[in-house]
Amino acid sequence: MGKQINNTFTWVIKNLSTLQGLEVRSKIFVVGGCKWRLIAYPEVNDADGYLSLSVYLGVPDCCESLPSGWKRHAKFSLTIVNQLSEGLSQVQETQAWFDENAPGWGFPPMLNLKDVSDKYGGFLVNDEVMVAVAVDVIEVVGSLDAPEMSESMDIKGFKVLPSQVKSVNRLFESHPDIASKFSIKNQSLKTAYMNVLLCLAETLHQSPMEISEDDLSDAKTTLAYMKSVGFKLDWLEKKLDELFEKKKEEADKIRMQNIEEELKDLRQKCSSLEALLKKEKTGVLAAKAPFLFFNNVNDDDLKWILRAVMYTLIMMLFISI
């Protein structure tokens, strides 16, 4: 997930523990008419309490999209945000020429922590790391490969895009004290938090049918974190609880429908088995009927029956002669 305001781009790397030893790339963003991308290489070992993160700023698809001889000179800063204390964030700044031979620059590693208490001291929270980059393009050789971003506007101390002004104004009109306890001063981080808040509000205004269980779980984690940095979000918490309850009702309804279908199938199977059992019983009784008759006849009666049969046979023989 990544959000951009002017020359600042914020990237939240989720599920870091599952990305061990992999190259992780952000989405492409545009600064100074140039396309950029962040690249990270995480190393996480919970058993040993070890966290390492290398981060680079790079030019995406430079060989395919840019003309021969292209290069660009940029000054940039990379920040690994401490989500519990802004003052502990790790910041590195430099300037460099990006070209075909050196399309990426960064700091290996920016973060290298061992035996840090409280889940890596605020750098890794809910298995997420937040990285911010600010880029100032000094000089470009070759054509620009993307349009400029719109200028930002200031709303209650937060820098937002013109397209976000209406949404942010609506937030402060409906909830004037929403940021009354938000004390972070760094403008890049303030912008990043506002972007997260707008995304959270948008997510929680979906209908129960549109939003997934995973989205709700992520929203719950994000909401708790946003409250921890000073935002007053009781209204969003209420909305989240309502969505959880409606999703539960929806899940219960689906589960009951499934049970009813299974019960219907079982009843049909029982009915078929009862019919088969009745048929088998009828066949067994029919096969046993002659034996049941002779079982109920005593010896005298049996002698009489045999004599009658023999007499009948003799008479039939006599008649035939």
UniProtKB/Swiss-Prot annotation:
Entries under SMART domains matching the protein: MATH (SM00061)
Domain (MATH): residue spans on this chain: 6-135
Keywords: Coiled coil
InterPro entries listed in its UniProt record: MATH-CC_domain_protein, MATH/TRAF_dom, TRAF-like
CDD domains given in the database record: MATH
Residue stretches in coiled coil: 232-283
Keyword Coiled coil: yes
Name of the protein: MATH domain and coiled-coil domain-containing protein At3g58260
Organism this protein belongs to: Arabidopsis thaliana
Organism phylogeny: Eukaryota, Viridiplantae, Streptophyta, Embryophyta, Tracheophyta
